[in-house]
Amino acid sequence: MSKAVRMEETKASIGKIISLQKMVDPRGNLSIAEGMKDIPFNISRVYWTYDVPSGACRGGHAHKHCREFIIAVSGSFTVTLDNGLNKQVFLLNHPYQGLLVEIDIWRTLDDFSSGAVCLVLAEDSF
């Protein structure tokens, strides 16, 4: 069984953690993700999941023509990536970091904390 890894320590061959711009302000912090600048593709679609029931899983598929960048904008969850040869589990729990998922990588999201929000920036509108 794979174990979740801290994002600061991760250099994965299946997925890649990317730190986003972070502006710290006493009034509240701000992070930015720009296509072709912070992430390596143009963003065609943005979607998010929320109110995920305890024990539920999301994803459970791969995309043949679409890379995705997954961010835990609130709370935490795990993402399991599988390329058919290797599996790796990532704990996403910082709104200023995200996980780049390449084409043809199977992804499953689970272990959502209460109130977790998963934001996905997708390369294609599929």
Give the predicted meaning of each segment:
Residues 94-99, 104-111:
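Well-ordered alpha/beta subsegment
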